[in-house]
Amino acid sequence: MAGRSGDSDEDLLRAIRLIKILYQSNPPPNTEGTTRQARRNRRRRWRARQRQINSIGERILSTYLGRPEEPVPLQLPPLERLTLNCNEDCGTSGTQGVGSPQISVESPAILGSGTEE
């Protein structure tokens, strides 16, 4: 796979196959012919096993990909530097390239009272 240095594709595919086998080893519980409490307990145990499988899968992938489990937090500029109006000097507020273009809103005096003449 493009862009990976040090990791072979075969190792990654092997990890994916292993995770797939883990998920297939825990099918959803049968919902027929039992009391509501028994079904609820079965679903609760199934969800607990799914959480364990999720954490094992994350550990396997992080081992093969060499990435941390938690994403790196995005560094944002301080709130004091963010502005909502971009009438003058756009791009110097520290938000250049972040988000969508800003749209200036006309004041109510310019828009009128809303009644047609």
UniProtKB/Swiss-Prot annotation:
Residues 93-105 have a biased composition (Polar residues). GO terms for molecular function: DNA-binding transcription factor activity; RNA binding. GO terms for cellular component: host cell cytoplasm; host cell nucleolus. A motif (Nuclear localization signal and RNA-binding (RRE)) lies at residues 35-51. Residues 37-49 have a biased composition (Basic residues). Escorts unspliced or incompletely spliced viral pre-mRNAs (late transcripts) out of the nucleus of infected cells. These pre-mRNAs carry a recognition sequence called Rev responsive element (RRE) located in the env gene, that is not present in fully spliced viral mRNAs (early transcripts). This function is essential since most viral proteins are translated from unspliced or partially spliced pre-mRNAs which cannot exit the nucleus by the pathway used by fully processed cellular mRNAs. Rev itself is translated from a fully spliced mRNA that readily exits the nucleus. HIV-1 lineages are divided in three main groups, M (for Major), O (for Outlier), and N (for New, or Non-M, Non-O). The vast majority of strains found worldwide belong to the group M. Group O seems to be endemic to and largely confined to Cameroon and neighboring countries in West Central Africa, where these viruses represent a small minority of HIV-1 strains. The group N is represented by a limited number of isolates from Cameroonian persons. The group M is further subdivided in 9 clades or subtypes (A to D, F to H, J and K). This is Protein Rev. It comes from Human immunodeficiency virus type 1 group M subtype A (isolate MAL) (HIV-1). The lineage of its organism: Viruses, Riboviria, Pararnavirae, Artverviricota, Revtraviricetes.
